[in-house]
């Protein structure tokens, strides 16, 4: 029989795929002899089978769960549902990739009316027992029965108001009894049934709920954001409870071995006495810094410091740990590699190498490539910041600078983002349901919560600026107002600025400045460049793009789109003259006006790149894109160009196509109008000649013909290019070389790549169009169906954002092999937006491409992703 359940001592840290990250680490800590409450893990395979079996836990798996429950009961000497020696357990999810706050947890399972009173007598602590029971009712109702946790808060507030207290821990045993009655009554009125009293039924329902939570909206959103496949599933950890809410010698906390915001080598975290785990992250009470534990419980603190040091050394990385103290005894509930900001990730990686803890190869694996994005964007201008006065200060939960319009709900922030408005999400406290709005916000501010609250952890993971726990503010979601302590009121849509590095909050917008990449960044990226074999170029159309990309380490331009230069007001007129020309002579006259403009552009780009390779694509879009379509715009242009309205309108209509993206564009334009290819070739080659002569930069122009489907198209256009290029080079007296290649962006070009390589000296895979044509999706319209496809598990990711390796990737593999067979020295690259996607970069490395090309700000990301792909290939991670 297949094994679906493992006791903690049966596992180890290498079993992440089966036991999930939490289960594997609990097993590893158990093996290291650390104080871990005993338990068992239900595997990820049980979760995937749950979905395969129509969201059912089949009897064979249920039997194994009960068998291992029996083992746990023997180990602990306690029994689930036994009032004399009651066992209470926690039920927690644990995927192989960390998903903090995205799935569901239940504490104190096994509680019922009888057990509650038994625990009260056994512990001589009725308040603790009843507090644990009311928490369980609330969590079980939320996670298992989908009765919102927030719907119970009104009863807590009601009892606190009646008693005249502000904090939950000021309620006594009688108050807890009252809450239990209110909670159970609310449960029955809402669901039409009594709260379940059978602990084994509670357990099975809880396991089912954790499996179900793998597919809840916030988990799905997080998985899509972090490239975690649905097929992985989650494990479930069932662990004997230890209690931080038994009194003033009990407590709970979360800590990191280093500061997750800065990377400083110093124990960092928070704890609460007389509390359970969710109290710390929920932000309901303000926790104490971990250093204060040294005064409160010095022996426990020293034991925790020693364990923290051992764990970091063992895992070779910064650890994020959860712990509970029960009646003065320390228990470790979790350890995992800690989520951290980009700045912290760099510092930790560099410091670990300097400390001799890890190698350079291991260090480059400790920074998520996409995190670098947070380092490449502007920060507040120091002069502007100095002139500004903060209206309040909170906790600097996640660094960075954010400026935007205030919104009070995640939905409103998401709607604002869709209309192009930069939003700052302001909440009393965030919850996992806010993930969609948090993901698109420039910054996040909360009234409650500490440095390990939900808002802080999620913001750091996303690289989003966050200021948490801002005391003295009043957030009214209903009135859509934010009131500061001095009485200042900010309404929805008003602008505020957040400094996540200091916790300062400012009214209005503060000027920003470009990021500076020095210090740890330079060293770290130097290691990445030493390791990687895949080159990284940029997609750039202007000298500014080129300069920015070189600053970020680009090794050339993989795609320069010539048409983007045509839309400037001074040039568009000449382009339009060329389009409406009736004769070849008229068209050539118009092209002669465009030639010096294009040549000047290319000279500036060549100079900016300092002799690095530059691939220039010939004109690609259909001609109608350069003409107006509304009658009033056509009339205005006709008057400006001195032609009749009817003539111009007729030309516009003649160029109209039902499916222009599959119409007269790319190389088809050059076949119909060879003079366009001739003019562009002259601009490209003459610019290279001028820069060679004037600056001494030996340029090898790379001329790329777009949208080839048939080798004869390329052969025809190449003949036009060669005739003009050879003529210009001969006249120059230089021994300049050039290359002619093509974009592989149609399926036919991919499957006939062996023939195409007879004419092409290089291939650049245009994966945007190749994806569009392989799927038959319109890139501009596919968004309408993607959410439905995600929800129905038809697709796991957007194929225009992450390369489809099974379909489009198979075409690329085939084209690479066929191209190399025909021309062994063919140069191979990719220039679609996939060039900056992590998994796509790894794919490009593995299939043997020479380079990837991406937007300037994604160049460092691609450099690191290429290094990580190489480390994986060498098995040095």
For every predicted segment, state its role.
Residues 310, 480-486:
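Short alpha-helix capping/helix-loop boundary micro-motifs
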Residues 356, 506-525:
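Short, compositionally biased
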Residues 92, 517-519, 527-877:
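Conserved alpha/beta-domain cores
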């Amino acid at each position: 029989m297949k094994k679906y359940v493992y006791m903690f001592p049966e596992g180890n840290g290498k079993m992440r795929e089966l036991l999930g990250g939490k289960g594997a680490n609990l097993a590893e800590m158990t093996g290291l002899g650390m104080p871990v409450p005993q338990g068992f893990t239900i595997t990820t395979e049980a979760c995937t089978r749950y979905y395969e079996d129509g969201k059912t836990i089949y009897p064979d798996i249920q039997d194994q769960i009960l068998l291992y429950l029996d083992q746990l009961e023997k180990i602990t000497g306690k029994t689930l549902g036994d009032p004399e020696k009651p066992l209470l357990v926690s039920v927690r999810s644990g995927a192989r990739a960390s998903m903090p706050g995205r799935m569901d947890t239940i504490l104190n399972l096994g509680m019922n009316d009888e057990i509650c009173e038994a625990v009260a007598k056994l512990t001589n602590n009725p308040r603790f027992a009843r507090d644990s029971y009311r928490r369980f009712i609330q969590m079980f109702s939320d996670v298992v029965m989908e009765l919102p946790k927030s719907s119970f808060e009104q009863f807590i507030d009601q009892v606190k108001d009646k008693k005249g207290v502000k904090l939950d821990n000021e309620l006594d045993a009688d108050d807890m009894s009252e809450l239990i009655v209110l909670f159970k009554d609310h449960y029955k009125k809402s669901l039409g049934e009594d709260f379940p009293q059978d602990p084994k039924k509670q357990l099975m329902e809880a396991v089912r709920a954790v499996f179900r939570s793998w597919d809840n909206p916030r988990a799905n959103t997080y998985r899509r954001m972090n490239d975690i496949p649905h097929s992985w599933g989650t494990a479930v950890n069932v662990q004997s409870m230890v209690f931080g809410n038994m009194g003033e010698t009990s407590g709970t906390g979360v800590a990191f071995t280093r500061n997750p915001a800065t990377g400083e080598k110093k124990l960092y975290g928070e704890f609460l006495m007389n509390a359970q785990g969710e109290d710390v992250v929920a932000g309901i009470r303000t926790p104490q810094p971990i250093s204060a534990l040294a005064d409160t419980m010095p022996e426990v603190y020293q034991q925790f410091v020693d364990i923290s040091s051992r764990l970091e050394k063992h895992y070779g990385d910064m650890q994020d740990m959860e712990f509970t103290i029960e009646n003065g005894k320390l228990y470790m509930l979790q350890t995992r590699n800690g989520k951290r900001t980009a700045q912290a990730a760099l510092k930790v990686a560099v410091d670990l190498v300097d400390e001799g803890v890890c190698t350079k190869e291991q260090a480059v694996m400790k920074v998520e490539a996409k995190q670098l994005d947070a380092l490449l964007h502007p920060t507040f201008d120091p002069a502007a910041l100095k002139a500004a006065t903060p209206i309040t200060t909170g906790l600097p939960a996640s660094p960075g600078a954010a400026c935007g319009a205030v919104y009070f709900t995640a939905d409103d922030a998401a709607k604002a983002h869709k209309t192009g408005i930069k939003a700052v999400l302001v909440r009393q406290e965030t919850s996992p349901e806010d993930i969609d709005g948090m993901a698109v916000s420039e910054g996040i501010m909360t009234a409650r919560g500490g440095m390990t609250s939900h808002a802080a952890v999620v913001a750091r993971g996303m690289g989003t600026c966050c200021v948490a726990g801002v005391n003295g503010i009043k957030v009214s979601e209903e009135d859509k107002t934010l009131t500061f302590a001095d009485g200042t009121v900010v309404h929805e849509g008003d602008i505020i600025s957040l400094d996540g590095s200091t916790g300062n909050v400012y009214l209005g917008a503060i000027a920003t400045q470009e990021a500076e990449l020095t210090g740890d960044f330079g060293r770290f990226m130097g290691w990445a460049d030493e390791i990687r074999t895949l080159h990284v170029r940029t997609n750039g159309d202007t000298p500014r793009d080129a300069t920015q990309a070189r600053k970020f380490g680009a090794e050339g331009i993989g795609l320069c789109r010539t048409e983007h230069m045509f839309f400037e007001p001074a040039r568009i007129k000449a382009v339009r003259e060329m389009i409406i020309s009736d004769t070849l002579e008229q068209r050539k006259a118009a092209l002669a006006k465009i030639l010096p403009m294009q040549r000047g552009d290319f000279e500036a780009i060549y100079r900016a790149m300092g002799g690095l390779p530059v691939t220039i694509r010939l004109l690609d879009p259909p001609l109608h894109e350069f003409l107006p379509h509304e009658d009033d715009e056509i009339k205005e242009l006709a008057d400006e160009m001195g032609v009749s309205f009817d003539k111009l309108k007729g030309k516009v209509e003649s160029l109209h196509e039902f499916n222009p993206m599959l119409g007269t564009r790319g190389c088809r334009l050059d076949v119909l109008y060879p003079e366009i290819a001739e003019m562009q070739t002259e601009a490209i080659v003459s610019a290279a000649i001028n820069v060679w002569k004037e600056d001494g930069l030996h340029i090898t122009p790379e001329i790329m013909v777009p949208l080839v489907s048939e080798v004869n198209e390329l052969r025809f256009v190449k003949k036009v290019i060669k005739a003009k290029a050879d003529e210009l080079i001969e006249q120059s007296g230089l021994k300049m070389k050039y290359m002619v290649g093509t974009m592989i962006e149609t399926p036919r070009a991919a499957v006939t790549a062996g023939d195409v390589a007879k004419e092409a000296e290089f291939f650049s895979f245009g994966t945007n169009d190749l994806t569009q044509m392989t799927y038959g999706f319109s890139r501009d319209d596919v968004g309408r169906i993607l959410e439905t496809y995600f929800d129905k598990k038809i697709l796991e990711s957007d194929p225009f954002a992450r390369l489809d390796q099974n379909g489009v990737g198979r075409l690329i593999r085939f084209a690479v092999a066929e191209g190399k067979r025909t021309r062994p020295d063919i140069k191979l690259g990719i220039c679609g937006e996939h060039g900056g996607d992590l998994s796509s970069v790894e794919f490009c490395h593995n299939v043997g491409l020479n380079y990837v090309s991406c937007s300037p700000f994604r160049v460092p990301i691609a450099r690191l992703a290429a290094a990580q792909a190489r480390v994986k290939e060498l098995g040095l991670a």
